Every structure is written in C-alpha cells, then in structure tokens.
Amino acid sequence: MTKLLIALILFSICWKPYSAEPIASFFDGLDSRNECKARLDRRLTGFSGLLYSHSKYGQEPYNTSRNCVLMLVAPIGYSIRVRALQFDVASTENARTCEKDTLHVFDHETTLDPESYAPARIDDITSPGPIIGQFCGHFENRILNTSSHNALTLWWHSNPNGSNSKGFKLHWGSFRVSKTGNCVTGEFSCGNGECIPIESACDRFADCSNGEDLIHSRQMAANCQNIELDPLTTVSGVFVLLFSATIILSLCGFIMFVCCLCKCLKSTIPIKGASSHTTTTTATDYKPDPPQFYPPSPPKMPPPSAASSYTPRLHHHFEGPLVPSETSAFHSSNRMQNHYSVNSDINGDYTYVRNDVHRNLL
C-alpha cells in the first residue's frame, strides 16, 4: 500500500500531459517563413500564436540593426489582443519615450481578408494605421494593445549599438464581444461578454481578458481534450482528505514497525560481560578462578657481620657412639631435635641457625 501511494505521488509530480501550444513565430528568424522584412508583405493569420523577438530567444540577446514589420490577422468578426508574457528591451532613463530599441503597435482602420495577402487598400502598404503603442524596458504578463478590427501591425527595430537584453515573448489571440452576451457553437464564453474560439480556450495561455479560460473546470466543461491537468487541484475535496489521511496512517504504521523492529533487535543482542551458560552449570564443570594474589615473601635477614672473624661451620653433634639402650622413638626425636636445634659455639660468640641460612640462600 505504501509503495502504491509513493508511486502515485511521484506520478502526480512528474506527469506532464500534452497541452495544445499555439504556433510559434519569430520577428527575426532563420528560415524564410520567419525572415525579417521591412515591408507589409508578411502576415500571421489564425486564432492565436506566439511571437518571439529572435530565433535564439532565451539563449542570446536579440540582434542589432533590425527593422522588422509583421502583420497579425484574425478571422473576420474578431479583434486581436496582444499580451507580453516576457519583455526585456533596452531603454533610456525615460522609458516612456523609447528612443532606442522599440516595439511599435499600429491599429488598422479597416477589416482585412485573412485569406488574401493583398491589402484591402493600397494605402495599407505604406500606412498600416495609427500607432497605438510603443514599448521598451522590462515587464511581464501585461496586455499591450487591442485592435479595433481584425488586424494589428507590429514594427520592431533595434539600434546598431547592441544590448545585453533578452528580447520579448508575445502571445496574441482573437476574441469578439457578443452583443447578446451569448456565444455561438465552437466558442468559449469568458463570462464578461467576450467570446473566444474553443481552440484558444484549450491551451495554457489566457485569451480571455479575465483569465477565465485557464480554469480547469471550465476547460473540461468545454470538452477540451489537450489540457494540462493537476491531479491535486482537479479532484474533489473528499478525495484529497481521504488521500491525505491514508498517507498519514501509512507513515504512522511505518514508524511503529521500525520501533518494534529496533526493540526486538535490542532484546536479542547479548549484554557485554554476561555469561551465556547461566543455567546449565554443574559441579563437574565448575572450575574455581585462580587467586589474584601471591603469598607474602619471607622477611630478609641481615647478612652476618663482616667484623667477626669467626666462620660458622657445621658441628657433628653425634661424635660419640649411641647408647644402645635408647628406644627408637627417643632416637628419632633426638635426631630431629639435633637437626633443628640451636647450637652454640664453643666460644659463645655467634649462634648458627640452619633455617636462617636456608632463608638467606633463598
């Protein structure tokens, strides 16, 4: 059970389902479709898209000495809204004037046919309409401008001096304002009177001005197929509560198991210094420990004085013949007494003791 819960958690973290991405284009690209052009002969048509300042956005600063013009055209009946997701363009101290590198926005005064590359009027070639915005500096997630009809023209130019700024990443989308407040089939209602194409509601970018198209429940109600789901935010509160309780109980059970295991291992480990045979000892197996002490040494007697010229010698106490009438017991005791008795010197100067000599020799 614990392994299954861990697998679900890892799956919810690592799982990133496919989400619909708008088509990405570049002001200053490497191929012919994204080539920088200085005239109104390049168009991007559709419901929405992403637009980068240059092909190596995020890797290198934008290119210098660029003069690129690009037209955005939506289906007839829709307007265009441009949002800056990331914007980093070098500017002067007064960012309102944007005297150096600048992105200009022009609003067309007439409706353009998205199916035709020929302009509706010849004047559109040289005059895309009034300028409604110019941008530089640094900001994020900001709506730049909204068109009056179905077309906007963007003009991006950079000076030859160079800059370390990253450039910009724009998202443009189409919408229309419903007079009745209702959207037709194939559209998504933003809830504020705006309607957007259902394809735009199923991506991960805000096409509604209020961001209503990023709510997962609204996307699922619109039958969006390719949406990025977060399991922890799309499930019900009861499921989240049960899932959390299961994780907590599993952790408590694991902690209790570890504690019991440690307790069992501690009880089986023998104590240091304890005897392993405490109940099976017998009298035959018992061996007393040797004593941890030694008997005291005998006292040392002082050596005989060198001042005396007398050298002790062994006297023969039995120089004469023994009396035959003495009993064997008397003879034995007399011999023992003579052997260990104290003998005096003839002169009476020094007493010789056999035991003392033996002790000194030891």
From Swiss-Prot:
Carbohydrate attachment residues: 63, 145, 161
Protein name: Abnormal cell migration protein 13
InterPro entries reported for this sequence: CUB_dom, LDL_receptor-like_sf, LDrepeatLR_classA_rpt, LRAD2/Mig-13-like, Sperma_CUB_dom_sf
Keyword Secreted: no
Single Gene Ontology BP annotation: positive regulation of cell migration
Domain LDL-receptor class A residue range list: 182-225
Outcome of swapping residue 190 to Y: In mu294; abnormal Q neuroblast lineage migration
